[in-house]
Amino acid sequence: MKILITGVHGFVGSNLVKALSEEHTIYGLDIVSPVKDGVRYTFSWDYLDKEDGIPEVDAIIHLAGKAHDTKNKTVSDVYFKVNTGLTQKIYDYFLTSKTAKKFIFFSTAKAAADKVDGILTEDVVPSPVGPYGESKIAAEKYIQEHLVDDKQVYILRPCMIHGPGNKGNLNLLYGVVKKGIPWPLGAFENRRTFTSIENLNFVIEGLLTKDVPTGIYNMGDDEALSTNELIEEICKSLGKKAHIWKLPKGLMTGIAKIGGALHLPLDSERLRKLTENYISSNAKIKKALGVEKMPVDARTGLEATLKSFK
């Protein structure tokens, strides 16, 4: 199978190339186009407008996008220009392709909901908060408004993706624990769904090779983990004893309010993000792929990621 991957030089793109390149021919589409092992050739975006600019492919995986800026420094228009605009451009190209029959769009769980009561399923009425989620849901809507019968389209809503070499939020938390700083939020009981890169690769391979119905699919590991469990796993990987303090919730909430006024590292929003529940169901994608469980459990995937931080 010939596959075009946008954002091929990013973390997820690089891992998909490793997972798919032995059995498939991979082409890239990115803002930079250096030589990359496993990729036949990487094109720049202007090649979409050229006649015979990009070879005909069988499937397109659209990863390119503006990631969520947790510091809120990105102008909202940038999110819509990239996350919505580029999606429209590559999807229009897909619709005109004579050979491409499968399109996989990486949206985000945040397009569905910023907060989750209970378990998040694909049936939820989307209520994104902020330009990141809003730009992703706008891209989803455009795709859904332009579906065609002879092509299969998959909109994926993954929870936080991690894996070896990923320098994201887990790496930041790892750095805090490595310094020996006690975790003061042990009194908060929460559970969150994560997406191990091995499970992501498994899902993509299945969507490419199996006859899966067009639709929206949540993506995540089978097991949800608490922040306290994350701290324990990080300490385990470092060979350290976990120092988890169960300080009163009211005290920590008050400190967070003061922190917001004084621009300290812990404010009310960050406290919410660190202690809220965000559980997403992956039952629909497993049923579509004909499997009962993901190949890698959440803890095993986390261990592999943490090991790479050393």
Residue map of PLM features:
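N-terminal Rossmann NAD(P)H-binding glycine-rich loop of SDR-like oxidoreductase domains
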Residues: I3-E23
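NAD(P)H-binding glycine-rich loop region in Rossmannoid oxidoreductase-like domains
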Residues: S44-G85, K89, Y93, A111
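Conserved Rossmann-fold NAD(P)-dependent oxidoreductase catalytic core, especially the SDR/UDP-sugar
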Residues: K89-P131, Y154
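Active-site Tyr-X1-5-Lys
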Residues: S127-Y154
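Substrate-positioning beta->alpha
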Residues: N166-L172, G186-L208, T214-G215
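Conserved C-terminal active-site "lid" loop/helix of NAD(P)H-dependent oxidoreductases
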Residues: I197, E232, I255-E292
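Mid/C-terminal beta-alpha module of Rossmann-like enzyme folds, strongest
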Residues: K210-L266, L302-L306, K310
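Amphipathic terminal alpha-helices
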Residues: K284, E292-K310
